[in-house]
Amino acid sequence: MADFIQLKKDNILKIGIKDIEGNDTGEHLEFDMEDIELPLRLNECEARHRKNLEFLKMQFVIIDKKEDKKGKFILSWKEEEKLKILQEFYKREMEALDLFLGQNGTNKLLNGRKPYYSMYEDINDMLVPILPKLKLKADDIANKIKEKYSNKATEKNVLE
C-alpha cells in the first residue's frame, strides 16, 4: 500500500454560479487566496481588456475608411468585416477574463450564453464583492512574509 501526502486546502474561496433564474448551476469558481500571482493576473486581465478595446476601435476605424462593397448575401462587406472583428474581440476578452477566472471560468459564468460587448464589465461587476478579499489576502501574505523573516533576523542577532 502506497503512502500519500496532500497539501492543505486552506484559504480557497469557492464561488457558486447561478443561472439567470437564480438556480444553482452546480458550477463554481475557485480562487486560492494565498496565490500571490492572483492580483497580478487581475492586473494583466485589466490591461488586456484595455488593449482589446483599443484593438476593436482601431479595426473599426480601418474598416470605416475603406469603401463599402456589396456582400455575398444580406450583409455588406463592411458589416461582415465588423462582425468578424467583434468575434475576435470576444475571443480576446474571454482569454483575458480566463487569466483571472481560470480555464473556462468565463464560459462557466456565461452559462451557455454567447459572449457580448459589455461582458467584461458585467463579469467585473459580479466580482466586485471578492476584490477586497483579494487585497486583504495580498496584504496578509506580505505581512506574514515580513513577520516570518523579520523574526528570524532578530533571533539571529540575539544569538550573536
Locate predicted features.
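C-terminal charged interaction modules
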Residues: 94-160
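Short leucine-rich amphipathic alpha-helices used at interfaces
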Residues: 76-78, 83-85, 126-128, 133-134
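Ordered, amphipathic secondary-structure segments that act as subunit-interaction surfaces
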Residues: 85-88, 101
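Short, charged/polar N-terminal "headpieces" of proteins
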Residues: 1-58, 151-160
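Mixed-charge, low-complexity intrinsically disordered segments
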Residues: 45-84
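Charged low-complexity stretches with an acidic bias
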Residues: 17-20, 24, 68-77, 88
